[in-house]
């Protein structure tokens, strides 16, 4: 997905981005991190249902279709790496927070949404319902998920 490598920052509509940031900050403050991330995961699953992907014949097709949807949201891009018993998903170019919510909390909240989104898309492609997309680690620039 070399054409996406230069996509490091995105513009966001004023007001809308602020609302999302305030909502995430409020969820984390009022519900706690674990409950907020569970809720955000389910919101990602809802987005996957609202923006379904066409049936993919190859991993490359799936990656392309995921990236087309992510581009609609200006949420960066993903690279899929099939393994023997897993698929690694590397999400790059996350939208930067507004600076009000600390970067770690912002990225954790977005990671929860993305995990739900990717999980919903993968289940719709025939993936097992019992297998979840989980964040392996965040290196500060890239979110590394495992399915």
Language-model region placement:
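N-terminal accessory segment detector
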Residues: 1-97, 101-108, 138
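C-terminal non-catalytic interaction appendages of large macromolecular assemblies
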Residues: 107-147
